[in-house]
From Swiss-Prot:
Keyword Ligase part of the UniProt annotation: no
GO CC field: plasma membrane; proton-transporting ATP synthase complex
Top-level taxon in the UniProt lineage: Bacteria
Protein name, UniProt field: ATP synthase epsilon chain
Gene3D superfamilies with a match to the protein in the record: ATP synthase delta/epsilon subunit, C-terminal domain, F0F1 ATP synthase delta/epsilon subunit, N-terminal
Molecular functions (GO terms): ATP binding; proton-transporting ATP synthase activity, rotational mechanism
Similarity comment: Belongs to the ATPase epsilon chain family.
Purpose: Produces ATP from ADP in the presence of a proton gradient across the membrane.
Membrane topology according to the record: Peripheral membrane protein
Gene it is expressed from: atpC
Cell compartments where the protein resides: Cell membrane
Quaternary structure, from the entry: F-type ATPases have 2 components, CF(1) - the catalytic core - and CF(0) - the membrane proton channel. CF(1) has five subunits: alpha(3), beta(3), gamma(1), delta(1), epsilon(1). CF(0) has three main subunits: a, b and c.
InterPro entries recorded: ATP_F1_dsu/esu_C_sf, ATP_synth_F1_dsu/esu, ATP_synth_F1_dsu/esu_N, ATP_synth_F1_esu_C, ATPsynth_dsu/esu_N
One Pfam family recorded for the sequence: ATP-synt_DE
Source organism per UniProt: Desulfitobacterium hafniense (strain DSM 10664 / DCB-2)
Length: 132
């Protein structure tokens, strides 16, 4: 696993990350997408989940609510709907959001079920990004 590639994560709020990474794993629609240096060109959507990447042998995490990834010329650019590095996640707030979404899903009456499911998925992604 010699070498690195440039990893950029951009969200509507601005640049979230620019690092020389050794490996990145993205939440894809049909499972995880793993990218190493010199990966073949690729454009794909990503789903709600956790982006895991390795820099200098250390694994870091970013919670995302989806977006797109482009791989080209040893550069990986992630255009994320939202992107929150794990160390910035307010874990108590994420746990409370998870609890609210679970409560809504048990009631089911008078709620938008899909919206509650997505809120639960986002909360779980934030929790997973914050935890080691």
């Amino acid at each position: 696993m010699a070498g690195t590639f440039t990893l950029r994560v951009v969200s509507p709020e601005g640049n979230v990350l620019k690092e020389e990474a050794e490996f990145v794993v993205l939440p894809g629609g049909n499972g995880e997408i793993g990218i190493l240096p010199n990966h073949a060109p690729l454009i794909s959507s990503i789903e709600i989940g956790v982006i895991r990447y390795t820099v200098n042998g250390k694994v870091e995490k970013i919670a995302t609510s989806g977006g797109f990834v482009e791989v080209s010329d040893n550069k990986v650019t992630i255009l994320a709907d939202t992107a929150e590095p794990g160390e910035r996640v307010d874990l108590d707030r994420a746990l409370a959001a998870k609890e609210r979404a679970e409560k809504r899903l048990t009631q089911r009456e008078g709620i938008d079920v899909r919206r509650a499911e997505l809120a639960l998925m986002r909360a779980v992604a934030r929790i997973n990004a914050a935890r080691n």
